Amino acid sequence: MRPLTLFIATTLSLLICAPTLAKTTLIHCGTLIDVPGQAPKHNQSILVIDNIIVSITDGFIDPGTIGTVDDFEFVDLSDSFVLPGLIDCHTHLTGEILPSHERMRRRTQESEAHAAIDGVVNAKKTVEAGFTTVRNVGSPGSVALALRDRINSGIVPGPRMFVSGPAVSVTGGHADSTNALSPILRPDLPSHLSTADGPSEARKAVRARIREGVDLIKITATGGVLSPTAAGVDQQFFDDELESIVQAARMMGRKVAAHAHGTDGINAALRAGVSSIEHGTYLDEESIRLFIENDAYLVPTIHAGKFVEDKAKIDGYFPDAIQKKAAEVGPLIQDSFARAHKAGVNIAFGTDVGVGAHGTNAQEFIYMHEAGMSNEDCLISATINAAKLIGAENQIGTLEPGKSADIIAVPSNPLDDISTMLHVQFVIANGRVIPLSQ
């Protein structure tokens, strides 16, 4: 039997056997980068049933050969470059960094309901930019968990979300939600707090988040730029606390992502066994050795570094405690990324959007390329590597039969010019075509 005839016969049998309400989508791809790092393919047809890629075949299949299907959509991308949906491993979809007075107003006068509404808007911006999967690493209460579930059910358009819930911090540390608040404004309910002191509390904080349904654990191993305290950016958890967190998370099947700027905190977190370091600003040769030895990932967030560097130049945008840290740390992140990448550290794409405008995630590609990463490796970082870090490489990261239908298209070849990733013109997220706003 000829290959094309066999393909059509197989397709028809799949459609006949599929559930009555199955959605069938046929996509013609002019150029297909199905597995970043491998040679592009030309004139390909992708068949999707519901949210799963059923087949990818050479040539443009005539839509008429699909047969009679109640819910059928044909997508012509024969003039486009088609890729796997992108993955951002560091986002905050339910918030955004604003000038200090507005940020404080929101902290004291708005509720989690406001954050939920913001999350719906920001999720749509993110998926329209071609990011069909994100790790959401830090958000108030259960807001991001609810957003994840509503996206999964198809009620809200947005990316597939892997959610950490509130980050775990030491008292007074980077993610202590009561920092800079008057005692009378501090929340009373323990569920609103993100602090843990000592190995026992650290283990309990991990278990409590897993009870709430998180997909991973986020910790703040060091101080942070945007916490409104003059506590620096060095190590904040003790080594035994870090070890307790990682051990408790592993026992329940969760990975740990560690926010870390200072060298001592980066290295302590890596020795404890975290899966990723977020930011990694002051990494050193020992850090690089530990990254490679532990097969850990750096999530660079250059996007956020550029944002805080720029805003630190505006009088009054940040309170004094933040302004000084932003001016010092922001300019260093891109260079730290460059050194890590050159040394062979695993890189997983991540922006820290929320620090910077939602929907601008692809700007990170430009910054990574400026720092010496090839266009091909940029794409690998946001697909294959990111999927491996999340632990979802059997579902996302490449376009292959049996994987999720997360598919995007851009107007020109990103291997020649990575800036084309700023101009996504088509998105399917988990089998759903996303109408674009522009």
What are the functions of these language-model segments?
Residues 17-18:
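N-terminal signal peptide c-region/cleavage motif recognized by signal peptidases
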Residues 32, 37-83:
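Histidine-rich, glycine-flanked metal-binding segment
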Residues 44, 382-384, 388, 401-438:
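C-terminal cap of metal-dependent C-N hydrolases
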Residues 80-155, 171-175, 240, 264, ...:
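Metal-associated gating/positioning segment near the N- to mid-region
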Residues 94-115, 171-190, 225-238, 295-330:
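Active-site gating loops and adjacent loop-to-helix segments of metal-dependent hydrolytic enzymes
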Residues 97-101, 144, 173, 227-229, ...:
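Histidine/acidic-residue-rich catalytic or RNA/ligand-binding cores of hydrolases
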Residues 105-107, 251, 255, 320-321, ...:
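His/Asp/Glu-enriched, well-ordered alpha-helical/loop segment
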Residues 146, 201-298, 327-347:
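Histidine/acidic residue-rich metal-binding segments in metalloenzymes
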